[in-house]
């Protein structure tokens, strides 16, 4: 049974109903419709913490989806799952792949910066300040890109850049 029929959340049900109506109205191929169904089911599973199911749906959506912009969001969501699972190297890979298809994803830049900052903090705890600085510098670059795309967002990152004198 499609996930859209079993989800009990009002907002998710409403989204599913509207999405189904739009899929009938908007001229799309059956492959695009099927890709969107997998994407929608992946988002639903992800929101419930069912990451294995979400990944299966996202991989199917990737197999079917041809539009680079739409693929960027699928890849981004796969990156989110890997981030949640602590698989930071994999997460970075998927965020990079998302940005290759859509360079206007500030949330991907932000998440990459958060991972780099976390790795910098880990390096400090391990007593390696040189490696830590390299990770912090990389985090700064990603945060600058996120902020450039959406000025006024990422206030904490902006403040960190100022405090650490990494903002130009």
Curated annotation (Swiss-Prot):
Q: Where are the TPR repeats?
A: 35-68, 72-105, 120-153
Q: Name the family the entry cites.
A: Belongs to the Ycf3 family.
Q: State the annotated membrane topology for this chain.
A: Peripheral membrane protein
Task: Give the organism's phylogenetic lineage.
Answer: Eukaryota, Viridiplantae, Streptophyta, Embryophyta, Tracheophyta
Subcellular location per the Swiss-Prot or TrEMBL entry: Plastid, Chloroplast thylakoid membrane
| SMART domains listed in its UniProt record | TPR
Q: What does this protein do?
A: Essential for the assembly of the photosystem I (PSI) complex. May act as a chaperone-like factor to guide the assembly of the PSI subunits.
| Protein's UniProt keywords contain Methyltransferase | no
PANTHER family reported for this sequence: CELLULOSE SYNTHASE OPERON PROTEIN C, TPR REPEAT-CONTAINING PROTEIN MJ0263
Identify the gene encoding this protein: ycf3
| Any one cellular-component term (Gene Ontology) | chloroplast thylakoid membrane
Return one Gene Ontology term, BP aspect: photosynthesis
| Protein name (record) | Photosystem I assembly protein Ycf3
Q: Which UniProt keywords apply?
A: Chloroplast, Membrane, Photosynthesis, Plastid, Repeat, Thylakoid, TPR repeat
Q: What is its main location?
A: plastid
Organism, scientific name: Daucus carota (Wild carrot)
Matching entries from InterPro entries are given as: PSI_Ycf3_assembly, TPR-like_helical_dom_sf, TPR_rpt, Ycf3/AcsC/BcsC/TPR_MFPF
